[in-house]
Design a protein with these regions (language model features):
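Cytosolic juxtamembrane N-terminal segment immediately preceding the first transmembrane helix
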Residues: 1-37, 50
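Transmembrane-helix exit segments and adjacent C-terminal regions of multi-pass membrane proteins
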Residues: 2-16, 449-511
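Membrane-interface helix caps of multi-pass secondary transporters
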Residues: 15, 19, 37-55, 59, ...
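12-transmembrane solute porter fold
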Residues: 23-37, 42-43, 271-439, 463-471, ...
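Helix-breaking motifs and short loop linkers at transmembrane-helix boundaries and internal kinks
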Residues: 53, 85, 106-112, 123, ...
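Central cavity-lining transmembrane alpha-helices of secondary-active solute carriers
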Residues: 61-79, 125-132, 323-336
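Helix-loop-helix hairpins in multi-pass membrane proteins, especially solute transporters
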Residues: 74-78, 82-215
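Hydrophobic transmembrane-helix bundles of small-molecule transporters
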Residues: 172-287
Length: 511
């Protein structure tokens, strides 16, 4: 086995003919492409619905299965890293995503598409982690999470806006939703080819066997999340409790949760350790993430209803919003790094700034719900929203790392992902959708001299107003709440060899 390299930053898996200065940039580019990929792309939703004759809820369900798939590999990532080489992992992830994209174009079954989207999301995170974990010393030579996470979220959260923007334009140019799938299939094959040519197999430690991995636990938690997403995604379509599928899935949720909980409590190496749930500040942290998702879910229902149903903007017109969101995300992530590393201010004040940005979005949208609004007027509110979301996601992830020891941190990321990766967002979207329908029906029933457009405007303004009140109350709570890191000196990321030895001791001791 080759010796572990010491000294300046190196990438020993790279072949000698690759210039050292561009080696880390190659992996950053690979991570960028991985984050663009998926199983189904929401930007092509109207074309997918028309071509496959399926409902909007079906396409949304397929997309959300991919989002859930992205969340589930976290507890397995280091086990994969210490069993396979970087070359093997990247080639496998790229080929798996390429296969899923190709199969999605020729599959008409919604359940199969959901499965393919989940698998694509699973390998998407595996590929991204393997790329960025190998350049972290280049990104921060001191293994500082307060530098690494803002830069990481520039790619991860930023590409959540770039991917639909690219999808909309490719679909418009080629007049087919296949365009993005072919583009991502080609991008993944390009990654596999470049990794095959530019790298070689390199191990920095003796490989660990893939034993004691709780695959069934992963399946149970995934099934639970998918069932919850199903309920609130299809709730309006089935008229909630009136639909038999809704009642069946509602019954399945506690059953699945029971089996997942019992497996977690009674096996030696569970998917999520019971101890990971016992940190006293974890529940408030999850509550803050849920709050952000509540405020951030208004664009999916209220803003889209306003721009499409009232202003009648098309997909190409509103695609510019994705670029504004991308700019807000980059600025928010960089602001977190500036706040922590340069200003060295409290976490509470940072989260307060983020919440003020989210509140600014809601207030501006409340005031702007008028017919005849030009599209440029929405740029500042959208920028404020994504700026605030980026602050919350980045700062709270840093705080989570401070809260939990490293052996539980990646489990914590999955637990946080239960909230931020589609589940709570879908719940909030379902609530907003039901509330909007209720307010529209109520305003029509009042027999006021309003036409349909005016009724929609009044209903939207009512819901934006309620959200403003909720955000204002929470802002007041933040102003009197003090959140500081668990320790004065923030932790550093351990070396991968140290993590590997820790995992080996845990496996040998049976703990």
């Amino acid at each position: 086995m080759p010796p572990i390299p010491t000294g300046p930053f190196t990438m020993p898996m790279m072949n000698g003919f690759v210039p050292k200065k561009i080696q880390p940039w190659i992996y950053v580019f690979f991570a960028f492409l991985f984050q663009l990929a998926g199983g189904m792309y929401a930007g092509a939703m109207p074309h997918v619905m028309g071509d496959m004759c399926i409902m909007r809820e079906d396409v949304t369900m397929i997309v959300l299965c991919g989002v859930i798939g992205v969340n589930m590999p976290f507890p397995f990532l280091f086990r994969f890293k210490f069993r396979f080489t970087n070359r093997q992992l990247l080639i496998t992830a790229a080929l798996a995503i390429a296969a899923c994209n190709w199969l999605c174009m020729y599959t008409e079954s919604v359940p199969v598409l959901c499965l393919l989207s989940y698998v694509a999301g699973f390998f998407k995170l595996c590929g991204t982690f393997e790329c960025l974990s190998n350049v972290q010393l280049w990104m921060t030579s001191k293994r500082d999470f307060t530098i690494f996470f803002p830069l990481l979220y520039c790619i991860v959260v930023g590409n959540m806006s770039l991917s639909p923007w690219i999808t909309v334009h490719l679909t418009y140019i080629f007049q087919s939703w296949y365009a993005m799938h072919w583009a991502m299939t080609g991008a993944m094959l390009f990654i596999a080819l470049m990794v095959y040519v530019l790298t070689h197999d390199f191990r920095f430690m003796k490989p660990l066997p893939l034993i004691s991995l709780d695959w069934l636990g992963c399946v149970l938690w995934s099934a639970l999340l998918i069932e919850i997403v199903f309920l609130f995604n299809y709730g309006e379509y089935y008229n909630w409790w009136d639909g038999r599928p809704f009642r069946v899935v509602t019954f399945m949720v506690p059953v699945t949760f029971y089996f997942a909980l019992q497996r977690m409590r009674h096996i030696r190496h569970p998917y999520i350790a019971p101890e990971a749930w016992l940190y006293k500040r974890l529940l408030p942290l999850l509550a803050v993430f849920a709050l952000v998702e509540l405020i951030n879910s208004t664009p999916k229902i209220l803003q889209n209803t306003f721009t499409s149903g009232v202003l009648h903007f098309g997909a190409m017109s509103t695609s510019v919003f994705y670029l504004v969101e991308w700019a807000g995300t980059i600025c928010g992530c960089m602001f977190v790094m500036f706040w922590i590393k340069v200003l060295r201010q409290k976490f509470t004040r940072l989260l307060t700034v983020g919440l003020m940005a989210l509140l600014a979005y809601e207030v501006q949208m409340y005031l702007m719900v008028t017919p005849g609004l030009d599209i440029e007027s929405l740029f500042i509110p959208i920028f404020c929203r994504t700026f605030g979301v980026a602050i919350f996601f980045t700062a709270l992830t840093i705080y989570l790392e401070e809260l939990m020891p490293f052996q539980h941190f990646f489990m914590g990321l999955t637990m946080v992902g239960f909230i931020r990766n589609g589940v709570v967002d879908t719940i909030c979207s379902g609530i907003y959708s039901f509330s909007l329908r209720h307010h529209i029906a109520e305003n029509f029933a009042r027999a006021m001299p309003y036409d349909a457009t005016q009724v929609i405007l009044v209903s939207l303004k009512q819901l934006f107003g309620v959200t403003c009140i909720i955000a204002t109350v929470v802002l007041l709570i933040f102003l009197v709440w003090d959140i500081q890191p668990v320790r004065d000196t923030l932790k550093r990321m351990p070396y991968w060899s140290v993590v590997g030895r820790l995992l080996r001791r845990q496996m040998s001791s049976g703990k």
